[in-house]
Amino acid sequence: DGLAKLEPSPLATKDRVAYIDVANYGQDLALLAECDLVIEAIAERMDWKNDLYAKIAPHLSADTVIASNTSGLSINTLADTLPAAIRPRFCGIHFFNPPRYMHLVEIIPTRSSDAGTLDALETWLTSRLGKGVIRALDTPNFVANRIGVVSILAVMHHTAAFGLGFDE
């Protein structure tokens, strides 16, 4: 109900809210068996993510791709907590905010990620969602956030070098 009220809409059109089923961890985990792709997007805490993976892993089908939308935690470290059978179907998928308007998505493979799974995910992101995809290494903050930090530091340096206030 809240999504339909947001301006601008986080969805392509407001009627798309009808495609979303509200669910919770206590009663609806079995619904995950019907999903082709599960994207985890909770707070950037390794312990919370690991706990969530332990809860959802038993409910995923043998073909479900699972991805973390982390913006900087190690994808390999996250993968290490998953059952071995799931690891080839796990990767990082970093959308930028707001995802409806931001074109770029980073795919971050793990040591165990299946190349065919990553290729299929990239095809889906480009053809169905219209995203531009960059493959990133499992390095701190991946590609775009590293560039962003360097850019912010450069602005701060030049602002100080020219004697400007940061509000000018």
Residue ranges: model-predicted function:
Residues 1:
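Beta1-alpha1 glycine-rich phosphate/pyrophosphate-binding loop at the start
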Residues 4, 8, 61, 123-131, ...:
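Generic secondary-structure signature for well-ordered alpha-helical cores
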Residues 4-66, 72-77, 84, 104-105:
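Rossmann-like NAD(P)-binding element
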Residues 126, 139-168:
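Helical "substrate-binding/catalytic lid" subdomain
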